[in-house]
Structure formats: structure tokens, C-alpha cells
Regions:
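N-terminal regions immediately upstream of nucleotidyltransferase
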Residues: 1-74, 78-134, 138-141
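Terminal (often C-terminal) interaction modules
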Residues: 1-20, 33-53, 262-265, 285-359
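Phenylalanine-focused residue identity feature
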Residues: 3-5, 15, 52, 74, ...
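Charged, low-complexity, helix-prone segments enriched in Lys/Glu/Asp/Gln
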Residues: 27-30, 34, 233-237, 341-344
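Acidic carboxylate-rich catalytic motifs and surrounding loops in phosphoryl-/glycosyl-chemistry enzymes
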Residues: 54-61, 145-157, 318-325
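Catalytic cores of NTP-dependent nucleotidyl/adenyl transfer enzymes across multiple folds
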Residues: 66-67, 103-312
């Protein structure tokens, strides 16, 4: 462990007590405002089509299914009823994706989603997304919500909205897949890792993952099934892995640094890149003693330096999904700009005891 100047530790503590906590408060207010408007919209969607029941609910002070991608960009995952007639398939699928196939062709008429099933028996993410997007547009008109919500004009294939003229919100239909785990497309857990414990791994696999009706990762372009495939999502697993105080605080610090310095034009970086590198850092440093106050600066700087390396190599492997590169769709020029910015922050944190006073 590197020596930590007292000024460095005090500066980080002040940063946490002021900027990190302020960000958390402001984010909560933002999500509350967004969900108030979106919740009203989803009531009208449900009135038009009862199969799309809103799952946007406040539970223990948090809205379920809401995910911040950046300070002004959010996803809302709307969980649908699968009716139990589909099998999960991740063989011969686009990287990071899976398919839902009728378990028995005779059950086609029993499915809640009959008209979205292809001739081959697959539940098409594209068809579900298209129908849902049409319903959202109609619900905005019927609910007279045009002053608060509008469909993004640069997007015609999903329910991406501009809310309160300030925030981008992508409404995504999805399914929960519990008590199963991807066998072919997933590279986690690694047999050599000592983190997390086997009991936590078992808990994560029991809880499962989600399938999102959104475009496949850029690496998947050109695959014939990409429109019908569902993107595999591990948000629930990430929350379990970041449950301990030190790791959770580290992520909050990284996101605060992002909001202040790394939310760059063209979005070369998003929160998902920080989450991914933090997960890799957790594998490198599995012991709880490596995530206490005295070691947190080492962890933060290690993640920043690893991010610089990924930006320079123009590759950021997904933590869970095999063959998925999170930088694949980013321009080289934007990644180079981001690398310089991250390097400046990493150098300041490593060499300047008062760095967090100015960050």
C-alpha cells in the first residue's frame, strides 16, 4: 500500500462529505422528478395496452428499475410478465444477447405475447420494442403530456424520451430471468477468482439477470438474429457485488469525478465504464481490508490508471459478457480526448495532496 498524506486523506473525506453527498441528494431529486412524470405516462400506456403494466414503483425509498447512465441520461426498465412458456437460449446469439424461444409450439396461443413471436418460435425484442414505442407516443398525446415529455427526434426505434426538456430517458421493456445463468455468452465467475465468496456467487445466480428489449451491443452488428435478440443485463448482480460500504463509496466517488470532469461531448465515457473497471479492481483486491478509508485512494488511482490504459488501447471488455467491448462504438478521437482528461485527474490524485480540494 502506498503512503497516504494526511492532507490527501482529509481532502478525500471533505470531498465525500460535500460533493459526493450533494450529488447523491441532487440525483435523488432528479430521479423523483423524472419518475413522477414517467409514472403518469405509464398509466396511460397501461390504459391503452394492459399487458404493459408499469413496474415503476417506489420501494424502500428507491424507484425500482431506474438506472442512471450519466447526469442527464437514464434508463427505466419495465418488467413484463413472461407467462412461463419460453426457454432461455444463448447459443449462436449476438455477443451479449440471448433469445427467448417457445418451449412448445403448441403453447403459442397460450402466450401473452403471441403476435410478437416469430415464425421460428422466438419472442422478438424488436417487435415488442416497436409496439411499446407506438404506445408511448399515443399515451403522450392522450395524456396531454407534450409539455413535459417528447419522443427524441433522433431516435425512431425505441422509446427514448426527452423529459422536462433536460433529461434523456429510455423506457425499456424487459424480462427477469431468475434461478438460471447464461452458459455460453457469460465469462463470470472466473474459476481463478477469490472474489466474491461462493455464497455470494450462488445468491447472484439464484437472483439471475434481466433481458432488455434494446439494440444489441455494437459488436453484434451484422448478425441475422440481432433484431429478435434480447440484451443481457446484470444490474442486479452489480448491486449485490457493490453492497459493502467501501466498494459502494468508491463507486460514488468515481461517479462524482465523472460528473465534474468526464462527462465529455460525444459521451466517450459513461457510468458503465467506471462500474466495469471497479468490478475488475474488486477481483484484483478481494480482501475487505483493501477497501477501507486508508486504502481507498489507492483503489481510486488504480481504477483511473486502468481506465487510461483501456482508453489508449481503445478496448474495455465487459465484466460479465464474453466478446463485448464497451468502447467498440466510440470514435478514436473522443477516446483520445478522454484518455488525456483521465490521465490529468489520475496524476493530480497521485501527486498532489490537495487534489480533492480542486476536483
Amino acid at each position: 500500500m502506498a503512503f497516504v498524506f494526511p492532507e490527501h486523506r482529509d481532502g478525500l473525506q471533505k470531498f465525500v462529505n460535500t460533493r459526493v453527498r450533494r450529488r447523491k441528494t441532487e440525483l435523488y431529486k432528479t430521479i423523483t422528478n423524472i419518475c413522477t412524470v414517467v409514472g403518469e405516462l405509464l398509466k396511460h400506456v397501461e390504459a391503452l395496452e394492459p399487458r404493459f403494466i408499469s413496474s415503476l414503483k417506489l420501494v424502500d425509498g428507491r424507484y425500482q428499475g431506474v438506472k442512471a447512465l450519466s447526469p442527464q441520461s437514464f434508463e427505466v426498465h419495465l418488467y413484463l410478465n413472461q407467462m412461463g412458456v419460453f426457454n432461455f437460449i444463448d447459443e449462436a446469439c449476438p455477443p451479449g444477447c440471448a433469445m427467448l424461444k417457445l418451449s412448445d409450439e403448441r403453447k403459442r396461443s397460450m402466450s401473452l405475447w403471441t403476435e410478437f413471436i416469430t415464425a421460428s418460435g422466438y419472442l422478438s425484442a424488436r417487435k415488442v420494442r416497436s409496439r411499446f414505442t407506438s404506445l408511448v407516443s399515443e399515451a403522450i398525446r392522450r395524456g396531454k403530456l407534450q409539455n413535459q415529455i417528447r419522443v427524441s427526434i433522433d431516435n425512431h426505434f425505441s422509446a427514448k424520451l426527452i423529459v422536462l426538456e433536460r433529461y434523456t430517458v429510455d423506457l425499456i421493456p424487459c424480462f427477469r430471468c431468475g434461478s438460471i445463468w447464461p452458459q455460453n455468452g457469460c465469462c463470470w465467475p472466473c474459476c481463478e477468482t477469490t472474489w466474491p465468496s461462493q455464497s455470494i456467487i450462488d445468491s447472484i445466480k439464484l437472483q439471475g439477470f434481466s433481458l432488455l428489449a434494446k439494440d444489441p451491443f455494437p459488436a453484434a452488428k451484422g448478425v441475422t438474429t440481432e433484431g429478435d435478440a434480447w440484451q443481457v443485463n446484470f444490474t442486479e448482480a452489480e448491486e449485490i457485488l457493490f453492497a459493502t460500504a467501501g466498494r459502494k463509496l468508491c463507486l460514488s466517488i468515481l461517479k462524482t469525478l465523472y460528473d465534474q470532469h468526464l462527462d465529455l461531448p460525444g459521451k466517450p465515457l459513461e457510468y458503465i465504464h467506471l462500474v466495469t473497471l471497479l468490478l475488475h479492481e474488486c477481483e484484483k483486491h478481494p480482501r475487505e481490508s483493501e477497501w477501507i478509508e486508508d486504502t481507498l485512494l489507492d483503489r481510486i488511482n488504480g481504477i483511473l490508471l486502468q481506465l487510461v490504459s483501456c482508453l489508449q488501447c481503445r478496448k474495455c471488455p465487459h465484466f460479465f459478457l464474453r466478446d463485448v467491448d464497451l468502447f467498440r462504438s466510440k470514435s478514436k478521437q473522443m477516446l483520445d480526448v478522454a484518455a488525456k482528461q483521465v490521465w490529468n485527474i489520475a496524476r493530480d490524485v497521485a501527486t498532489n495532496p490537495g487534489s480533492f480540494d480542486s476536483l
